[in-house]
């Protein structure tokens, strides 16, 4: 990367974006040392202007930003980093530091990613705490059985052309399939990658 360090006075603005949801999480700054550390460790490290030192996001909270990809803008003076965030990004507990932004315009598919993270967080939880935790506790066979049941019910609803019921059953199917994927340590990203692979053949 050919960064124009002189233009940015040795502090590069860095936009952090969630690779799964495309949500902008925060803005920070990097000097050359912070960028080198980020590239080496694949975790985002900033230069803190208030503390006057390097600061790895998550070093105290455990909410790291794992680097997936990065790209400079056309003027080589702003960096975009795509990340897989571990936990919330904002110190307020919000997923994004831009939490005050009205999110009604976000694409509906972003919700699926958030649902997937919520379902993943239920693994190993007290079975009494939620239906999802109960499913995990009952094991893979029970989860797979529910996927089969919901698949049949979705097909039956579609067969009789009941749109409202088809939507409800499809929602149940997607939910249980998400649980099954997480139980197998897989995600919708794995499924999407396979679809892309088939599409390009």
From Swiss-Prot:
Chain positions covered by the region annotation Phosphoribosyl-AMP cyclohydrolase: 1-111
Record EC number: 3.5.4.19, 3.6.1.31
Region (Phosphoribosyl-ATP pyrophosphohydrolase): 112-201
Keyword annotations: Amino-acid biosynthesis, ATP-binding, Cytoplasm, Histidine biosynthesis, Hydrolase, Multifunctional enzyme, Nucleotide-binding
UniProt KW Amino-acid biosynthesis keyword: yes
Pathway in which the depicted protein is active: Amino-acid biosynthesis; L-histidine biosynthesis; L-histidine from 5-phospho-alpha-D-ribose 1-diphosphate: step 2/9; Amino-acid biosynthesis; L-histidine biosynthesis; L-histidine from 5-phospho-alpha-D-ribose 1-diphosphate: step 3/9
GO molecular function, one term: phosphoribosyl-ATP diphosphatase activity
Catalytic activity: 1-(5-phospho-beta-D-ribosyl)-ATP + H2O = 1-(5-phospho-beta-D-ribosyl)-5'-AMP + diphosphate + H(+); 1-(5-phospho-beta-D-ribosyl)-5'-AMP + H2O = 1-(5-phospho-beta-D-ribosyl)-5-[(5-phospho-beta-D-ribosylamino)methylideneamino]imidazole-4-carboxamide
Gene3D superfamilies in the cross-refs: MazG-like (1.10.287.1080), Phosphoribosyl-AMP cyclohydrolase (3.10.20.810)
Pfam families linked: PRA-CH, PRA-PH
Assigned protein family: In the N-terminal section; belongs to the PRA-CH family. In the C-terminal section; belongs to the PRA-PH family.
Name of the protein: Histidine biosynthesis bifunctional protein HisIE
Organism name: Pasteurella multocida (strain Pm70)
Name of the gene: hisI
């Amino acid at each position: 990367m050919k960064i124009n360090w002189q233009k940015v006075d040795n502090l590069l603005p860095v936009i952090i974006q969630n690779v799964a949801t495309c949500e902008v999480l925060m803005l920070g700054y990097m000097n050359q040392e912070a960028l080198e550390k980020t590239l080496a460790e694949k975790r985002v490290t900033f230069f803190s202007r208030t503390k006057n030192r390097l600061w790895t996001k998550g070093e105290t909270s455990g909410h790291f930003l794992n680097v997936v990809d990065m790209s400079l803008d056309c003027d080589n003076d702003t960096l975009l980093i795509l990340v897989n965030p571990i936990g919330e990004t904002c110190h307020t507990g919000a997923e994004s530091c831009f939490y005050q932004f009205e999110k009604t315009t976000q694409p509906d598919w972003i919700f699926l990613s958030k649902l997937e993270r919520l379902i993943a967080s239920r693994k190993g939880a007290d079975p009494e705490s939620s239906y999802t935790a109960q499913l995990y506790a009952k094991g893979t066979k029970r989860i797979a059985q529910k996927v089969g049941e919901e698949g049949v019910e979705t097909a039956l609803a579609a067969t009789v052309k009941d749109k409202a019921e088809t939507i409800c059953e499809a929602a149940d199917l997607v939910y249980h399939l998400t649980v099954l994927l997480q139980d197998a340590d897989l995600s919708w990203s794995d499924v999407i990658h396979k679809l892309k692979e088939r599409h390009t053949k």
